Amino acid sequence: MAKEKFERNKPHVNVGTIGHVDHGKTTLTAAITKYCATQGRAQFMAYDQIDKAPEERERGITIATAHVEYSTDKRHYAHVDCPGHADYVKNMITGAAQMDGAILVVSAADGPMPQTREHILLARQVGVPYMVVFLNKVDMVDDKELLDLVELEVRELLSEYEFPGNEIPIVKGSALKALEGDKSELGEPAIQQLLDAVDSYIPTPKRATDKPFLMPVEDVFSISGRGTVATGRVERGIIKVGEEVEVVGLKPTAKTVVTGVEMFRKLLDEGQAGDNIGALLRGLKREEVERGQVLAKPGSITPHTKFKAEVYVLTKEEGGRHTPFFNGYRPQFYFRTTDVTGSVQLPAGVEMVMPGDNIGMEVELITPIAMEKELRFAIREGGRTVGAGVVAEVIQ
C-alpha cells in the first residue's frame, strides 16, 4: 500500500500507550494499526517492528520509541509506544514525545501493578492532561465480578492521582484477539470502541498560535537610530507590531512595546509560533535585555525561583555522572536558553540519587526564571548534561 499523503484537513492529536510491562501496550499498538489498515487509514506495523524501535537521542538521552500513525473519521493520530519502562520515564520527563492524551493499558488478569501506578503519577506530574483505559486480556478472566473489581481498582488509582477516575472511559477487550482479526466483541469491535473513546474523550489540543505569546530571548543587539532588537524563535502565540510585551526573568519584569518584527531581513506585521524573528523593543537599552529572559504577553507568565520537579538522571553510558549526588547538590539548571545555578532538596528518606534514577525533588534557583508547570529543563555540570527534568509545580 502506498503511503497516503498526510491529510491536513483533520485535526492532529498526539497519543501514546502507557502501563505496566507485559500488559499488552505494544500488542495493542499493533492491533490499532492493523485494524485501521483494513480501512485504508494506517500502515500495519507488526509487533516486532514496534518492539525493535530504534534508539533516538533526545538532549543526549538515549530513548527507544516507536512512532506509528493512523486516522479515524474525525482525526489524524501520531502514537508513541516504548519498549522498556526506562524509555517511558525518559520520554515523559524530556517531553520527547509530547502526549495530548494517553491510552493506559491494564491487564485484566493482573490488575494495576507498580508501573501502572508510576506511569499514572508521571502523567500527572509532566502534564499529560487526559487518559483513556484499555482493559486488556479480558478473555483470560472468566469471573465477571473479578473484572468489575479490576475496573474499580483502576478507577480508584486514577482518582488517587487526581484524574477523574469515575468519568474516564474504560474499554474492555483483547489486543491479541484483535490482532488476530477476531470479530467477536473483545476483538476488532473493542479496538473501534477504544478509538471512539479516544476521539470523543481526548480533546483536540489548542494550536500553538492560539496560546499567549512567548519568545525566549536568544540574542540582543542594538541598531543605531532604531533601538534594541531581541531575537529568538516564537514558542507560542502571535506578536503583532504595536503590541505591549513583558520582559520576564533574571531581572525585575519590564514592560515594552514591540515596534517592529523582522524575519529573513524583511519587516512583517506579525510573528507567530515557530517563526525565528527579531523584535524591535521600544525604550529599552541593549543592557536591559539578555539571553535567558522571555518576551511574553503581559500577565501570562511570572518569574520564580522555587519549584518541584520530576527528574531523570542520566547514566554514565549516556554521558552522565558516574557517581550519585546528595541533598544540597548544586548544578546548573538550563531553562530554554540559559543556565541558572540551583540547589536540590531530596524527598524525606532519600539519601542519594544514582545515575539512571528518576526522582521528584525541590529546587531553589539563585535567580528567577519565567516559569510554569510543564516547563522542561536540563541539569548540567560545566556545560555537560547530567539530567533532564520537568516543572511539576511552581512554589514561589
UniProtKB/Swiss-Prot annotation:
Residues covered by region (G3): 81-84
Keyword Metal-binding: yes
All residue ranges annotated as the tr-type G domain in the record: 10-206
Enzyme class: hydrolase
Record-linked InterPro entries: EF-Tu_GTP-bd, EF-Tu_GTPase, EFTu-like_2, EFTU_2, G_TR_CS, P-loop_NTPase, Small_GTP-bd, T_Tr_GTP-bd_dom
E.C. code: 3.6.5.3
Subcellular locations according to the entry: Cytoplasm
Region G1: start-end pairs: 19-26
Region (G5): 174-176
Main location: cytoplasm
Keywords: Cytoplasm, Elongation factor, GTP-binding, Hydrolase, Magnesium, Metal-binding, Nucleotide-binding, Protein biosynthesis
Region listing for G4, in residue ranges: 136-139
MF terms in GO: GTP binding; GTPase activity; translation elongation factor activity
Gene3D superfamilies reported in the protein's UniProt record: P-loop containing nucleotide triphosphate hydrolases (3.40.50.300), Translation factors (2.40.30.10)
UniProt GO cellular component terms: cytosol
Positions bound to Mg(2+): T26
Residue ranges, annotated region (G2): 60-64
Record field: catalytic activity: GTP + H2O = GDP + phosphate + H(+)
Residues annotated as binding GTP: 19-26, 81-85, 136-139
Subunit structure: Monomer.
UniProt similarity note: Belongs to the TRAFAC class translation factor GTPase superfamily. Classic translation factor GTPase family. EF-Tu/EF-1A subfamily.
Function of the molecule: GTP hydrolase that promotes the GTP-dependent binding of aminoacyl-tRNA to the A-site of ribosomes during protein biosynthesis.
Record HAMAP family: EF_Tu_B
Protein name per its UniProtKB record: Elongation factor Tu
Protein's gene: tuf1
